[in-house]
Amino acid sequence: TVSAPEDWSVHVPLDHSGEGWIAADFDALVDSPVHAGSLEVRHFRVLDHQHQLLLIGAPPGGWPPSFLDDVIAVCEATCRLMGTPPPAADRYQLVLILLENGYGGLEHDHGAVLHYSWAALEKPEGYRQLLQLIGHEYLHQWNVRRLRPAELRPYNYGSAVISEGLWFAEGITSYFDLALTLLAGRSDRPTFLADLGDELSRVQLTPGRRVQSLSDSAREAWVKLYKATATSRDTQVSYYRLGAATAFCLDVRLRRRNSSLSSLLRRLWGSHGRSARGFH
Protein backbone atom coordinates (compact mmCIF):
# COMPACT_ATOMS: atom_id res chain seq x y z
CA THR A 1 0.00 0.00 0.00
CA VAL A 2 1.01 3.64 -0.49
CA SER A 3 -0.08 6.48 1.81
CA ALA A 4 -0.42 9.81 -0.01
CA PRO A 5 -2.29 13.13 0.38
CA GLU A 6 -5.96 12.95 -0.58
CA ASP A 7 -5.52 15.16 -3.65
CA TRP A 8 -2.73 12.98 -5.04
CA SER A 9 -3.08 9.98 -7.30
CA VAL A 10 -0.81 6.94 -6.97
CA HIS A 11 0.21 4.81 -9.94
CA VAL A 12 2.01 1.46 -9.89
CA PRO A 13 2.24 -0.98 -12.86
CA LEU A 14 1.09 -3.94 -10.77
CA ASP A 15 -2.22 -5.72 -10.27
CA HIS A 16 -4.41 -3.60 -8.01
CA SER A 17 -6.14 -5.28 -5.09
CA GLY A 18 -8.26 -3.41 -2.56
CA GLU A 19 -6.23 -0.50 -1.25
CA GLY A 20 -2.91 -1.69 -2.58
CA TRP A 21 -1.01 -3.58 -5.25
CA ILE A 22 0.23 -7.15 -5.49
CA ALA A 23 3.65 -8.21 -6.81
CA ALA A 24 4.08 -11.84 -7.83
CA ASP A 25 7.65 -11.89 -6.52
CA PHE A 26 10.58 -9.68 -5.55
CA ASP A 27 11.64 -9.21 -9.17
CA ALA A 28 8.20 -7.82 -10.06
CA LEU A 29 8.25 -5.56 -7.00
CA VAL A 30 11.57 -3.85 -7.73
CA ASP A 31 10.67 -3.62 -11.43
CA SER A 32 7.57 -1.53 -10.67
CA PRO A 33 8.21 2.22 -10.24
CA VAL A 34 5.81 4.13 -8.00
CA HIS A 35 4.61 7.60 -9.01
CA ALA A 36 2.45 9.77 -6.81
CA GLY A 37 1.32 13.38 -7.04
CA SER A 38 -0.95 15.69 -8.98
CA LEU A 39 -0.21 14.04 -12.31
CA GLU A 40 -1.81 14.40 -15.71
CA VAL A 41 -3.11 10.94 -16.58
CA ARG A 42 -4.33 9.77 -19.96
CA HIS A 43 -5.82 6.37 -20.65
CA PHE A 44 -5.80 4.64 -24.02
CA ARG A 45 -5.89 1.20 -25.54
CA VAL A 46 -3.54 -0.47 -27.99
CA LEU A 47 -5.16 -3.43 -29.73
CA ASP A 48 -7.51 -3.87 -26.77
CA HIS A 49 -4.78 -3.75 -24.12
CA GLN A 50 -5.13 -1.07 -21.45
CA HIS A 51 -2.42 1.61 -21.40
CA GLN A 52 -1.80 4.52 -19.08
CA LEU A 53 0.24 7.64 -19.86
CA LEU A 54 1.51 9.69 -16.91
CA LEU A 55 2.73 13.18 -17.80
CA ILE A 56 4.96 15.03 -15.36
CA GLY A 57 5.55 18.51 -16.75
CA ALA A 58 4.42 19.99 -20.06
CA PRO A 59 5.89 21.97 -22.96
CA PRO A 60 5.58 25.78 -22.62
CA GLY A 61 2.88 25.82 -25.30
CA GLY A 62 1.16 22.67 -24.09
CA TRP A 63 0.98 19.29 -25.77
CA PRO A 64 -0.04 19.20 -29.45
CA PRO A 65 -3.67 18.09 -29.93
CA SER A 66 -2.37 15.07 -31.86
CA PHE A 67 0.03 13.92 -29.13
CA LEU A 68 -1.99 11.00 -27.77
CA ASP A 69 -2.94 9.85 -31.28
CA ASP A 70 0.74 10.00 -32.25
CA VAL A 71 1.73 7.89 -29.25
CA ILE A 72 -0.95 5.31 -30.06
CA ALA A 73 0.18 5.20 -33.70
CA VAL A 74 3.79 4.50 -32.67
CA CYS A 75 2.67 1.76 -30.25
CA GLU A 76 0.50 0.10 -32.89
CA ALA A 77 3.34 0.34 -35.45
CA THR A 78 5.62 -1.45 -32.97
CA CYS A 79 3.10 -4.28 -32.63
CA ARG A 80 2.95 -4.59 -36.42
CA LEU A 81 6.75 -4.66 -36.59
CA MET A 82 6.78 -7.59 -34.18
CA GLY A 83 3.97 -9.34 -36.03
CA THR A 84 1.92 -9.76 -32.85
CA PRO A 85 -1.59 -8.25 -32.78
CA PRO A 86 -1.51 -7.49 -29.02
CA PRO A 87 1.41 -5.94 -27.13
CA ALA A 88 3.66 -8.32 -25.20
CA ALA A 89 2.51 -6.89 -21.84
CA ASP A 90 -1.13 -7.29 -20.81
CA ARG A 91 -1.05 -3.76 -19.35
CA TYR A 92 1.37 -0.90 -19.89
CA GLN A 93 2.25 2.29 -18.02
CA LEU A 94 4.25 4.95 -19.84
CA VAL A 95 5.69 7.72 -17.65
CA LEU A 96 7.06 10.85 -19.34
CA ILE A 97 8.97 13.36 -17.23
CA LEU A 98 9.82 16.69 -18.89
CA LEU A 99 12.92 18.54 -17.73
CA GLU A 100 14.78 21.56 -19.04
CA ASN A 101 17.47 19.20 -20.29
CA GLY A 102 17.28 15.45 -20.49
CA TYR A 103 17.00 12.41 -22.71
CA GLY A 104 16.63 8.76 -21.84
CA GLY A 105 14.39 5.99 -20.68
CA LEU A 106 14.27 2.78 -18.71
CA GLU A 107 12.12 -0.15 -19.72
CA HIS A 108 10.12 -2.34 -17.34
CA ASP A 109 8.04 -5.47 -17.86
CA HIS A 110 4.82 -3.46 -17.84
CA GLY A 111 5.94 0.01 -18.82
CA ALA A 112 8.74 2.52 -19.15
CA VAL A 113 9.89 5.75 -17.52
CA LEU A 114 11.22 8.42 -19.88
CA HIS A 115 12.75 11.84 -19.34
CA TYR A 116 12.98 14.39 -22.10
CA SER A 117 13.77 18.07 -22.66
CA TRP A 118 10.77 20.39 -22.94
CA ALA A 119 13.03 22.82 -24.82
CA ALA A 120 13.70 20.19 -27.51
CA LEU A 121 9.97 19.95 -28.19
CA GLU A 122 9.97 23.46 -29.62
CA LYS A 123 11.43 22.02 -32.85
CA PRO A 124 9.78 19.44 -35.17
CA GLU A 125 12.81 17.16 -35.00
CA GLY A 126 12.66 17.26 -31.20
CA TYR A 127 9.05 16.10 -31.22
CA ARG A 128 9.90 13.34 -33.71
CA GLN A 129 12.81 12.22 -31.53
CA LEU A 130 10.45 12.00 -28.54
CA LEU A 131 8.18 9.69 -30.53
CA GLN A 132 11.25 7.64 -31.49
CA LEU A 133 12.24 7.39 -27.82
CA ILE A 134 8.73 6.24 -26.94
CA GLY A 135 8.94 3.65 -29.72
CA HIS A 136 12.36 2.52 -28.49
CA GLU A 137 11.14 1.84 -24.97
CA TYR A 138 7.88 0.32 -26.20
CA LEU A 139 9.78 -2.14 -28.41
CA HIS A 140 11.71 -3.21 -25.32
CA GLN A 141 8.54 -5.04 -24.21
CA TRP A 142 9.68 -7.68 -26.67
CA ASN A 143 13.39 -7.16 -27.24
CA VAL A 144 15.04 -6.96 -23.78
CA ARG A 145 12.27 -7.53 -21.25
CA ARG A 146 11.23 -10.92 -22.62
CA LEU A 147 13.64 -11.69 -25.46
CA ARG A 148 17.01 -11.23 -23.82
CA PRO A 149 20.55 -12.63 -23.52
CA ALA A 150 20.60 -15.77 -21.36
CA GLU A 151 23.01 -14.28 -18.84
CA LEU A 152 20.45 -11.62 -17.89
CA ARG A 153 18.11 -14.22 -16.39
CA PRO A 154 17.68 -14.96 -13.51
CA TYR A 155 18.40 -11.55 -12.05
CA ASN A 156 21.63 -11.08 -10.12
CA TYR A 157 21.30 -8.13 -7.75
CA GLY A 158 24.68 -8.64 -6.16
CA SER A 159 27.01 -7.68 -9.00
CA ALA A 160 27.21 -6.24 -12.49
CA VAL A 161 26.09 -8.71 -15.14
CA ILE A 162 28.41 -8.85 -18.14
CA SER A 163 26.81 -9.59 -21.51
CA GLU A 164 28.06 -9.24 -25.06
CA GLY A 165 24.42 -9.48 -26.10
CA LEU A 166 23.73 -5.91 -24.97
CA TRP A 167 24.58 -4.70 -28.46
CA PHE A 168 21.74 -6.79 -29.88
CA ALA A 169 19.33 -5.72 -27.15
CA GLU A 170 19.97 -2.01 -27.57
CA GLY A 171 21.47 -1.74 -31.05
CA ILE A 172 18.64 -3.56 -32.81
CA THR A 173 16.10 -1.50 -30.85
CA SER A 174 17.92 1.75 -31.67
CA TYR A 175 17.86 0.93 -35.38
CA PHE A 176 14.16 0.20 -35.40
CA ASP A 177 13.17 3.21 -33.31
CA LEU A 178 14.25 5.40 -36.24
CA ALA A 179 11.77 3.57 -38.47
CA LEU A 180 8.81 3.45 -36.10
CA THR A 181 7.68 7.02 -36.76
CA LEU A 182 7.77 6.20 -40.49
CA LEU A 183 5.79 2.98 -39.96
CA ALA A 184 3.34 4.95 -37.81
CA GLY A 185 2.78 7.52 -40.57
CA ARG A 186 4.31 10.31 -38.44
CA SER A 187 7.30 10.95 -40.69
CA ASP A 188 8.26 10.30 -44.30
CA ARG A 189 10.94 8.26 -46.06
CA PRO A 190 13.36 11.19 -46.67
CA THR A 191 13.19 12.07 -42.96
CA PHE A 192 13.87 8.46 -41.96
CA LEU A 193 16.86 8.27 -44.31
CA ALA A 194 18.18 11.58 -42.97
CA ASP A 195 17.88 10.33 -39.37
CA LEU A 196 19.60 7.07 -40.32
CA GLY A 197 22.35 8.99 -42.11
CA ASP A 198 22.92 11.14 -39.02
CA GLU A 199 23.21 8.03 -36.86
CA LEU A 200 25.71 6.41 -39.24
CA SER A 201 27.71 9.64 -39.39
CA ARG A 202 28.01 9.76 -35.60
CA VAL A 203 29.55 6.30 -35.68
CA GLN A 204 31.91 7.22 -38.51
CA LEU A 205 33.04 10.32 -36.61
CA THR A 206 33.83 8.37 -33.44
CA PRO A 207 37.57 7.46 -33.43
CA GLY A 208 36.96 4.83 -30.77
CA ARG A 209 35.19 2.58 -33.29
CA ARG A 210 38.65 1.63 -34.60
CA VAL A 211 39.81 0.72 -31.10
CA GLN A 212 36.90 -1.01 -29.39
CA SER A 213 34.88 -3.80 -30.98
CA LEU A 214 31.10 -3.98 -30.77
CA SER A 215 31.17 -7.01 -28.46
CA ASP A 216 33.78 -5.36 -26.23
CA SER A 217 31.66 -2.21 -26.03
CA ALA A 218 28.76 -4.30 -24.73
CA ARG A 219 30.89 -6.41 -22.40
CA GLU A 220 32.69 -3.40 -20.92
CA ALA A 221 29.59 -1.20 -20.56
CA TRP A 222 29.67 -1.01 -16.75
CA VAL A 223 33.38 -0.28 -16.49
CA LYS A 224 33.81 2.05 -19.47
CA LEU A 225 30.71 3.37 -21.25
CA TYR A 226 29.04 4.56 -18.04
CA LYS A 227 32.30 5.85 -16.59
CA ALA A 228 33.37 8.20 -19.36
CA THR A 229 36.72 9.99 -19.28
CA ALA A 230 38.32 12.72 -21.38
CA THR A 231 39.70 10.10 -23.77
CA SER A 232 36.59 7.93 -24.05
CA ARG A 233 35.65 9.20 -27.50
CA ASP A 234 39.07 8.16 -28.82
CA THR A 235 39.04 4.70 -27.25
CA GLN A 236 35.39 3.64 -27.03
CA VAL A 237 32.25 3.40 -29.12
CA SER A 238 28.63 3.17 -27.96
CA TYR A 239 27.04 -0.26 -28.42
CA TYR A 240 23.78 1.61 -28.99
CA ARG A 241 25.09 3.50 -32.01
CA LEU A 242 27.49 0.94 -33.45
CA GLY A 243 24.83 -1.67 -32.73
CA ALA A 244 22.27 0.33 -34.73
CA ALA A 245 24.75 0.70 -37.60
CA THR A 246 25.41 -3.04 -37.51
CA ALA A 247 21.67 -3.71 -37.46
CA PHE A 248 21.28 -1.59 -40.59
CA CYS A 249 24.01 -3.59 -42.36
CA LEU A 250 22.37 -6.86 -41.29
CA ASP A 251 19.00 -5.64 -42.54
CA VAL A 252 20.43 -4.73 -45.94
CA ARG A 253 22.19 -8.10 -46.23
CA LEU A 254 19.02 -10.00 -45.26
CA ARG A 255 16.87 -7.99 -47.65
CA ARG A 256 19.19 -8.92 -50.49
CA ARG A 257 18.30 -12.52 -49.64
CA ASN A 258 14.55 -11.85 -49.61
CA SER A 259 14.33 -11.62 -45.83
CA SER A 260 14.69 -8.79 -43.29
CA LEU A 261 15.90 -8.02 -39.80
CA SER A 262 12.32 -7.57 -38.62
CA SER A 263 11.55 -11.10 -39.84
CA LEU A 264 14.53 -12.41 -37.88
CA LEU A 265 13.40 -10.54 -34.77
CA ARG A 266 9.91 -12.01 -35.08
CA ARG A 267 11.38 -15.52 -35.42
CA LEU A 268 13.51 -15.01 -32.32
CA TRP A 269 10.45 -13.76 -30.47
CA GLY A 270 8.61 -16.94 -31.41
CA SER A 271 11.48 -19.27 -30.49
CA HIS A 272 12.97 -17.53 -27.44
CA GLY A 273 10.85 -14.55 -26.38
CA ARG A 274 7.42 -16.04 -25.79
CA SER A 275 8.91 -18.81 -23.66
CA ALA A 276 11.36 -16.44 -21.90
CA ARG A 277 14.29 -18.55 -23.11
CA GLY A 278 17.47 -16.56 -23.10
CA PHE A 279 19.57 -16.53 -26.26
CA HIS A 280 23.33 -16.90 -26.63
Tell where the protein language model's regions lie, with residue ranges.
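Intrinsically disordered, low-complexity linkers and stems that provide flexible hinges
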Residues: 1-52
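Active-site-adjacent structural elements in folded domains
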Residues: 97-100, 157-160, 219, 225-236
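Post-HExxH zinc-binding segment in Zn-dependent metallohydrolases
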Residues: 112-121, 146-147, 158-209
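Juxtacatalytic substrate-recognition/specificity segment
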Residues: 40-166
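Acidic/polar loop patches that form or flank catalytic/metal-binding clefts of enzymes
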Residues: 10-11, 87-90, 150-151, 183-193, ...
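Extracytoplasmic/secreted proteins, especially bacterial periplasmic and envelope-associated proteins
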Residues: 66-73, 77, 129, 133, ...
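An acidic intrinsically disordered interaction segment
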Residues: 130-145, 195-220
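Amphipathic alpha-helical substructures
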Residues: 190-195, 222-280
